[in-house]
């Protein structure tokens, strides 16, 4: 990845938004979260998408560029997770992010409520043959030690965790095995990014700042990181 900062899933909501990322300083292009069927349920606005099959041509197009493409997926069953991961991997996605951080996922799949379900989901996700990671909710109902052990055992590469102490820092302190950590929310400055990387994060995702600033956020963060590094 050319730069350690990327957009968060769901922040680039149109094909034009996604294509604009190609000319930016982002380290990767993260797509909107996709489901097996088109999702238009009014109670779950954050999950609305046209269905995975409408995004596959865009993945194939983006895969021809130098930037990594991250497909974000959500499913109601372990089988749906496995199916979506394989579909996007075959289309050329560089990595697959399965979100557990959504109310619809918590109400249907509920991957963090049962160790057997978690292992089944993680195994099917990792079987796609691409690097995979899981996006965690702000509050995880199981011990991080058990969570990370299950993910690593199944072959999942990393997790996306919040910037709060109860998120990525606590996870890294309690994790029984090495796992890549991507900080998923709450960072707004180059200083924030540097601190997260110094604490062990592999990369960060930006959500609200990207929505307000657009693709210019990446160049700004890069400039701020350079200034911080030069001042030390």
Where are these regions (language model features)?
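Catalytic cores of alpha/beta
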Residues: 16-21, 79-90, 140-154, 175-183, ...
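Glycine-rich phosphate-binding active-site loops on the catalytic face of alpha/beta enzymes
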Residues: 31-37, 95-105, 158-167, 187, ...
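A general structural motif
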Residues: 2, 26, 66-68, 93, ...
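Acidic (Asp/Glu)-rich catalytic clusters
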Residues: 21-24, 57-66, 85-93, 123-127, ...
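Alpha-helix-loop-beta-strand connector modules within alpha/beta enzyme cores
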Residues: 46-68, 112-138, 167-183, 221-232
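Hydrophobic faces of well-ordered beta-strands that scaffold small-molecule active sites
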Residues: 5-9, 27-31, 69-73, 96-98, ...
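Glycine/Thr-rich beta-alpha phosphate-binding loop at enzyme active sites
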Residues: 40-49, 100-116, 138, 142-177, ...
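N-terminal capping/small domains of soluble enzymes
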Residues: 1-69, 74-79, 221
